[in-house]
Amino acid sequence: MSVRKLKPITPGQRFRVVNGYDAITTDKPERSLIAPIKNSGGRNSQGKMTMRYTGGGHKQRYRIIDFKRTKDGIPATVKSIEYDPNRTAFIALLAYADGEKTYIIAQNGLKVGQKLVSGPESQPEIGNTLPLSRIPLGTVISCIELRPGQGAVIARSAGTFAQLMARDGKYATIKMPSGETRLILLTCSATIGAVSNSDHQLVVSGKAGRTRWLGRRPRTRPVAMNPVDHPMGGGEGRSSGGHPRSRNGLPAKGYRTRSKKNPSNKYIVERRKK
């Protein structure tokens, strides 16, 4: 993994830092595993805006990812490491021994030609998926299930990982990417290794246009709005906006919004550090 800093031959390239894409082996996706995406522009079925600051961007096709890895005991070969425009991590194309092909989230260190196996009998090696009950303590893991059979929902972004800290009864203690320590059932599965493209955090857009290519629109500062649009809007001249607030009036900058009655609170051993 590496990044490239471009020469400042234009204003848009002066501060731009791009991904080197050293790990990418092909730019042609598997046609049987892609699907169309309709750009909603942040609007719902009624045409009303439900998400601000999104819309436009380059046309993309969705890559169908296997987050469950349920083909236990069937060996698979890594055919390629590919770029996915819909996520920050790279993806890997697997060809199973029975002829099926699937995409998975690629882990750091995954190579073309490598053999992968999922299931409780597989070895704890990079890219293999096992139940938490069969993973050695202290192992770096990613693509973790929160409920058995649900599919991976935790640690799927570029460079993220969690760590298996302990086992007690029917639960495993996991150090989450956020720093939170949480209990997860031992029957949930996880993949060995950290997620690929760990240098993604070093990428700098360099110009507003490239951010628009990604489908992100300009964000309006709350203090520049009218009072009808935001609690921090209005005032004579350039005002500070008063106490920082969110759009719906809740205090910003450190205010805890998590419900004290949330049923999953009992599974949190230690809150994340702020």
Curated annotation (Swiss-Prot):
One Pfam family cited in the UniProt record for this chain: Ribosomal_L2
Record's subunit section: Part of the 50S ribosomal subunit. Forms a bridge to the 30S subunit in the 70S ribosome.
Taxonomic path: Bacteria, Pseudomonadati, Bacteroidota, Flavobacteriia, Flavobacteriales
Keyword Transport among record annotations: no
This protein's UniProt keywords: Ribonucleoprotein, Ribosomal protein, RNA-binding, rRNA-binding
Family statement: Belongs to the universal ribosomal protein uL2 family.
Protein name as annotated: Large ribosomal subunit protein uL2
Transmembrane feature ranges: none
GO MF, one annotated term: rRNA binding
GO biological process, one term: cytoplasmic translation
Region (Disordered): 214-274
GO annotations of cellular component type: large ribosomal subunit
Known role: One of the primary rRNA binding proteins. Required for association of the 30S and 50S subunits to form the 70S ribosome, for tRNA binding and peptide bond formation. It has been suggested to have peptidyltransferase activity; this is somewhat controversial. Makes several contacts with the 16S rRNA in the 70S ribosome.
